[in-house]
C-alpha cells in the first residue's frame, strides 16, 4: 500500500477515536451547566448564557489565529496544548461558586478549543479524499450524537453525587485525549505549504465569498446552540427532573444513527450542498415557533425531534461546503475562520437567548425567545438563498505568495 494511502487509512481511525474522546469529554459536562447553575443554584439564565457564550466566542472567534498558528507550526503541539487547557477549565468549573469563576472556567475551555479545533478540522481535509468527505462528516456526526448521549448519561448519573465529580471526569477525559495525540499523532503539516501566520490570515480575509458565507451562518448557529442552553432548561421545567435531559440526547442519537448516513448518501446525489443546508435550516426554524407554548413533555420531545432532523440534513452539508470553499494553501486559517459564524451565533444565541428566556418568564410570555429564534432562522434562510442563487461553489484560489 502506498505510504499516503496507508496514512489516510490509519488517519481515519485515529480521527474517529480522537473525536469520540473530545465529544465524550465535552458532553459529560456542558449539557449539565444550565441545570446546575440555573435550576439547582438559582442563578439567572443570563449569567449562565454569558458563560456559555464566552466559551463559544473565544473558541470560535479566535479560531482563525489558532488555525494560522497551526498552519505555521503544525497540528500536534496546538492540539495537545488546547486539550490540556480545556481540562484546566473543567477543574476551575468544579469549584465555581461565583459567576466570575464560571466565566473563567468557560474562557479557559474556549481558549483550549481555539487551539485544538481548527487543526483537527484541517486534518480531516488533509487525510480524507474530497469525494469521501461528505460521508466521513456524516460518520463524525453519528459519532457526535452517540458520544453526546453517552456523555450526558454519564454526567447525569454523576450529578446525583456531586457536580465536582462531573467536572473532574471531563478533565480526565481531555487529559487522556492529549496523551493519545502526543503518543499517536504524527507531526503532520496541515497545509500544502508552510504558510506564514499573517499570510494565512490575509488570504482568508481577502476571500469575500468565504467571508460572506461564514457571517451568514451566524443565524444558523443561534438556533443550533440552544441544544446546550434553553432546550435542556425547557425539558427540565416541563419534566420536573434533570434526568429527563438524557432523553433529549437519546433522540438525537437514535435519529443520527438511523437516518444521518442514509440521508447524506441519498441527498448528495440529488441536491447541491447549499440546497441541503437550506432545507435543514428551514425545518429547524419551523420547529422553534411552537416550543414556548408547549406544556407536555411528549409534544416538546416531538418538536426537538423535528429540530434534530433539520440539523441532520443541514450539518454534513454545511461542513462539506466549508471545506470545499477553503484554499488548500491555508487550510488551518480557513477552518479557523469558518468558526467565526459559530462564535458570533453562539455568543448572541447564548447570552441573548438567556436574556430572552428570563424576560419571557418575567412578562409571562414564555414563547418570546422561541418566536425570535424561528424568525432569525427564516432571515438566515433568505440570506443564504440570495448568496448561493448567484454564485457557483468552488474553492477559492487567490493570488499572492
Swiss-Prot record:
Coiled coil, from the record: none
Pfam families documented for this protein: MFS_1
Major subcellular site: membrane
GO cellular component annotations of the record: plasma membrane
Localization: Cell inner membrane
UniProt cross-references to PROSITE patterns, sorted A to Z: MFS
Residue intervals passing through the bilayer: 13-33, 34-54, 99-116, 139-159, 165-185, 214-234, 244-264, 273-293, 297-317, 340-360, 368-388
Entry keyword set: Cell inner membrane, Cell membrane, Membrane, Transmembrane, Transmembrane helix, Transport
GO MF annotation, one: transmembrane transporter activity
CDD domains named among the record's database cross-references: MFS_MdtH_MDR_like (cd17329)
Membrane topology, from the record: Multi-pass membrane protein
Family the UniProt entry places it in: Belongs to the major facilitator superfamily. DHA1 family. MdtH (TC 2.A.1.2.21) subfamily.
Protein name per the record: Multidrug resistance protein MdtH
Source organism per UniProt: Pectobacterium carotovorum subsp. carotovorum (strain PC1)
Gene responsible for this protein: mdtH
